[in-house]
Structures are given as structure tokens and as C-alpha cells.
Amino acid sequence: MGSDGTSAATAEAAIVPGQAREVWKNTILAGLANYIDAGSIVAGSAALALWASAYGLSTSFIGLLGAFSANAISAGVGALIGGRLCDRFGRKRIYQYDMLFYAFGMMWLVFATAPWMIVVGFVLVGLAVGADIPASWSLIAEQAPTGKRGKHSGVAQVLWYLGPVVVMVMFFVLAPLGLLGARIVFAHLAILALALTLLRSRMKESERWTQAQEEAKRARLAGEASAAISPWRELMRPKHLKSMAFLIGMYGMWNLWAGTNGFFFPYILSTVGNQTQAVSVGVQALNFGLGIVSIIFIFMKFADRVNQRLLFAISALMQVVAMALLAVFPLTLPVALLHVVLGGIAVGFGAQSFFQLWSSELFPTRIRSTAQGVTFAVVRFGLGIWSFFVPALTATGFHTLAWILTGFLAASGLIGIIWAPRNEGKSLEEIEAERSATA
């Protein structure tokens, strides 16, 4: 990347303790998008049974909510639009003001009194969280020091899992309040989004993005041929298409499992497994809590230092075994707990964490957020289409659905094991130089 890479590498080498604290603070502020995204998904899932009972929602309508929620199509559209805007106007503009839009959407869920209001709220919230993901993930990768990018990405993933834990604990406490308790949970997410808007206003723009813009401007003034290539045309180059195909395959297959498990698991437990609402959300909270422990003590500790492909393979195998338990055995609370413990540990250093890391590493700064937005959008679109049919599949036999989800995890694992990159310990500039040399 020429001067961009040189200056960025110099800046990394010059980081002092005070600056390091600032970088970590920015990582947390950017990563809170993950808290809000995952918290929104799980809050909606935990409220699903309550809404179904209060409004007499049909199986088809429940599928519609899943398809257009923050977990699927709406988030995909938001990521597609937000990713391109991030590369064009900067990361800060998107991640600062996007949370206001999120709060507006969440208020529809807080005050929803009819099914159509729930749909509107889900769509608006999904658009907002989708737009924020490329902005926050790009910023985290671009400001992280070389050799610590996985650790900084891990912080965002901890927040991704912390959101559901907080939401689930709140549902435990507020369960006697029924729908009022759900409204309180949604309100806490809206308030956090407003606070995050204020805190993010003090953050600086990504230095790498600023340098990339300056370099592009110099190239245009010099009449260089590379300056005439549009970002979309650049994204369509074979090496980038291959990277997107890998990411979509690996994360897309995994997300079909995760999206179904995350959005419908409490619903499945309370209907098919005949567990109470409190027990179902408690089991899910345990899953996310184990994920946090796994991220901190496995992913953040080893992702920058060991063979990432091997780390991914171990996680993939554990998740396949965990999901197969639900396919083979009757859906009882002990089986669900074993599934949660084994799978919860595995997901912390698996596809979700590596998707954030690899999607930030495999594309140059000029198109990084755009590429992340495209891959994220395709994955969420696929999940949205799939989610529409999950309630009907569950009604015809949960074990059939469990076998299908086991197959998704196996496919994701194979794709990751075969094509995973080896970027541990490298700077973004080193990765780009290597990819340019082999293109």
C-alpha cells in the first residue's frame, strides 16, 4: 500500500502506554455494536414466546419475524448500505450516528401494541445494527497494533456474547412481569444506544482510512490508472471474489446454525422441550457465558500466535458433536445443557470470531468495509430466507431440523479447515502485500 502501509506500520511501532489505553477504549466503544446486535437478536428471541401468546401469532408470522429481524434480512441490507458508506465517508460518521437510528427502531418494540409494530421495530433495528457492523469491525482491525489484532477483535466478540448474557439475566429477573419485562429489556438497549452516540462522538477517524483517502487523492491528481478503478470493480477482482466466497461459505453455513439456534432456541425449548420461559432463557444465557470465557482464555490468547487453521478446526469439531447431541437424543433439559456447555466453549474460538478477524484482513482499506458489508449481507439474506421455514420444520420434527443444523456446522468446518488463511502475527500491510504478490 505504499506510503499508507509505511506510515501505518510506523504509527503502530510508536504506540506508547497512554495511546494503548486509547486504542483499547476505542475498541470497546466500537465493539459495543456487537453487544447491541447480539442483545437485540436474543431479546427478540426471548420475547418471541411472549408475543406469540399475547397476540396469537401464527407459525408463519413467527417465521416472518425471524426473516426480517436484526438477525437476518434487515441486518443484511443495513450492512450492504453501511459498508459502502463507511469506505466512502469514513468509519466515524457511520458508527456515531447509526445508534440514533437504532434507538428509534428499538422504541417501536418498547411500545409495540400490535404485531405490525413488532415487524416495523425489527426491520429498523436490523438496518441499524447491520450498518454498524462493518464500521466497527473495520475500525477495530485498522487501529489494532500488529500482533494484537486477534486480541482486539476478541474484545468485540466478548461484547457480542455479553449482550445476550445481560439480556437473559434481565429476562430471568423480569419474567414475572411478562411483556412488560420484555419492554424494559428493549428500553435498556435503546438507552445504551443513545449513550453510545455521545461517547463515540469523541473518537477519532481511522488513521488507515484517512491515509488511504489521501493516497487515492494523490493518485487521481497524478492521473494514475489505478485511481480510475471504482471500489465495486476492485471488489470484483478474482482474489477478492475468492476471499468473499470463502467467508460466505464458512460463515454462512455456520450462521444458518447460529441464527436458528440463537433466535429460536428459547422458543424450541419452551414449546418442543416443554420447558418454562425462565428455564429456556437461562440455558441460553449459560451458553453465551461459556462463550465469553472461551473467547478470553482461548481466542484472545492464541489467535495472534498459533496456527489459526488448527484452532478453527478444533472448534468446528466440538460444535458438530454438540449439535449432533440434539439430533440423536430426545430434547430434554440435561441434553440441552450438555449441548450448551460443549457448544458454548467451542463457539468462542470458532467461525464467528474468525469471520470478524479474517473479513478485516483479506481486503485492502479502500474496500474493507464494503467487502465486509457484502459478505455479511449475503450471509444474513440466506439466514433470513432459511429462518422463514424454521418454525414449520420444527413443527414437523425437531430432530430432522437438528440433523440439518449439524450438516451446516460440518460444511462450515470443512470450508474453514481447507481454505483458512494463515495471518497470525502479520500486519494488515504485510497481508495485503502477500496477497498482491500472489494475485
Language-model segments: residues:
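Helix-breaking motifs and short loop linkers at transmembrane-helix boundaries and internal kinks
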Residues: 90, 111-116, 329-331
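Cytoplasmic helix-loop-helix junction between adjacent transmembrane helices
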Residues: 121-158
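Extracytoplasmic gate region of multi-pass secondary transporters
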Residues: 45, 239-292
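Extracellular/periplasmic helix-loop-helix junction of adjacent transmembrane segments
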Residues: 45-77
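Structural signature of the two symmetry-related core transmembrane helices
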Residues: 93-107, 310-324
